[in-house]
């Protein structure tokens, strides 16, 4: 779908109506996209935490949060405020600088990765040509922060958790990147906008999940491992490592780990939606909607409606995957560290490599179905 609302253009036009120049309007606009990302990420975390509490309660035949607002919807806010006012303790023998920098280095790359997530044709912060490659590069920074946090804590459980996190991330980063390369090969572009547009030809049948079922499965497994979700939560296994690299953290620093974990889960689900499930695309062509309403295709009403539907479709697809991830947490046992590494190196890596080679062959043989 090639139509949509351009927020920056609309914002500039709005301020031009007050007599401001386009340069001043652009300067005013600069911090707004990042604020929108932060608000969207925090709201997404609050919704996900509430969903996880309710789903886990249902899995264990409990009621779950009930008293903090209707159906307990304010419970995540109460949890956040509790962590915010807790004392920030740095262990006496810890490396204070690295101890403080670790959580920041974990959270910042995840936040920056949202820059390339599109919710519509023009609804993204930065349409860089190397969008998906930028995400892979940013995601490779996070293990450094985890290892740094484990090392700086001067605690054996923290160090072991940090080492596990680094080993796990390295093991699953490669098959994840190879599965993404298969999509890039079909699309001939690293732009997330181009990847979604390439899936808009024949509705749901154009989604990459039908042409890349193996890549979809590999990507989702690797994404869960990158997010350290059960059954891949070895770096913070409570029964073995207390809380892993988070053991010595409290207050706001611990909240940064907590926030980063859930933002990363939502980001991974959004990227699966974009890469494999058509992103913001929906079955009814925008031309038919405009014709039904007797409006031109570029009418403001059509643009706002298209943008709204695109956001809803992207978020719904992502939260379907978040729901699956939460269910997996309460229905699957934790694997051993050797099993986790074997799965990454001995199974997912060769499978993703074979999938990439097969995709290249199919593209040469059937360019009309696998990209021209």
From Swiss-Prot:
The keyword Transit peptide does not apply. PROSITE patterns: COMPLEX1_ND1_1, COMPLEX1_ND1_2. The keyword Transmembrane helix applies. Its EC number is 7.1.1.-. It comes from the Bacteria. It is an enzyme of class 7 (translocase). GO terms for biological process: aerobic respiration; photosynthesis, light reaction. It catalyses: a plastoquinone + NADH + (n+1) H(+)(in) = a plastoquinol + NAD(+) + n H(+)(out); a plastoquinone + NADPH + (n+1) H(+)(in) = a plastoquinol + NADP(+) + n H(+)(out). Keywords: Membrane, NAD, NADP, Plastoquinone, Quinone, Thylakoid, Translocase, Transmembrane, Transmembrane helix. The chain crosses the membrane at residues 27-47, 97-117, 128-148, 176-196, 204-224, 266-286, 308-328, 347-367. Pfam families: NADHdh (PF00146). GO terms for cellular component: plasma membrane-derived thylakoid membrane. It is a multi-pass membrane protein. InterPro entries: NADH_UbQ_OxRdtase_su1/FPO, NADH_UbQ_OxRdtase_su1_CS. One of its GO terms (molecular function) is quinone binding. It is found in: Cellular thylakoid membrane. NCBIfam families: PRK06076.1-2, PRK06076.1-5. NDH-1 shuttles electrons from an unknown electron donor, via FMN and iron-sulfur (Fe-S) centers, to quinones in the respiratory and/or the photosynthetic chain. The immediate electron acceptor for the enzyme in this species is believed to be plastoquinone. Couples the redox reaction to proton translocation, and thus conserves the redox energy in a proton gradient. Belongs to the complex I subunit 1 family. HAMAP family: NDH1_NuoH. NDH-1 is composed of at least 11 different subunits. This is NAD(P)H-quinone oxidoreductase subunit 1. The lineage of its organism: Bacteria, Bacillati, Cyanobacteriota, Cyanophyceae, Synechococcales.
């Amino acid at each position: 779908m090639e139509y949509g609302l351009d927020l920056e253009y609309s914002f500039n036009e709005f301020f031009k109506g007050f007599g401001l120049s386009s340069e001043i309007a652009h300067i005013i606009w600069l911090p707004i996209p990042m604020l929108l990302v932060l608000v969207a990420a925090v709201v997404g975390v609050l919704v996900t935490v509430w969903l996880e509490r309710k789903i886990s309660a249902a899995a264990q035949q409990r009621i779950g949060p009930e008293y903090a607002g209707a159906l307990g919807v304010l419970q995540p806010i109460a949890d956040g405020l509790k962590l915010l006012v807790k004392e920030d303790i740095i262990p006496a023998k810890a490396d204070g600088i690295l101890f403080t920098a670790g959580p920041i280095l974990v959270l910042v790359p995840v936040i920056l990765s949202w820059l390339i997530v599109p919710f519509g044709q023009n609804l993204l912060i930065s349409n860089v040509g190397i969008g998906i490659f930028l995400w892979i590069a940013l995601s490779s920074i996070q293990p450094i922060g985890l290892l740094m946090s484990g090392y700086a804590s001067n605690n054996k459980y923290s160090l072991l958790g940090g080492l596990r996190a680094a080993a796990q991330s390295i093991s699953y980063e490669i098959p994840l990147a190879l599965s993404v390369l298969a999509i890039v090969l079909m699309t001939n572009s690293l732009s997330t906008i181009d990847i979604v547009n390439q899936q808009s030809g024949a509705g749901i049948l154009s989604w990459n999940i039908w042409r890349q079922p193996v890549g979809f499965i590999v990507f989702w497994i690797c994404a869960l491992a990158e997010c350290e979700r059960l059954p891949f939560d070895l770096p913070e296994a409570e029964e073995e490592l207390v809380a892993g690299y988070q053991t010595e953290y409290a207050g706001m620093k611990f909240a940064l780990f907590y926030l980063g974990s859930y933002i990363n889960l939502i980001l991974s689900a959004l990227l699966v939606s974009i890469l494999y499930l058509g992103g913001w695309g929906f079955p009814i062509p925008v031309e038919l909607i405009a014709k039904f309403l007797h409006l031109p295709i570029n009418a403001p009403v059509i643009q706002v409606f298209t943008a709204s539907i695109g956001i809803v479709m992207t978020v719904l697809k992502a939260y379907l995957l978040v729901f699956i991830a939460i269910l997996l947490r309460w229905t699957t046992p934790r694997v051993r560290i050797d099993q986790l590494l074997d799965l990454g190196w001995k199974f997912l890596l060769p499978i993703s490599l074979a999938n990439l080679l097969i995709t290249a062959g199919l593209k040469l043989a059937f360019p009309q179905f696998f990209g021209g």
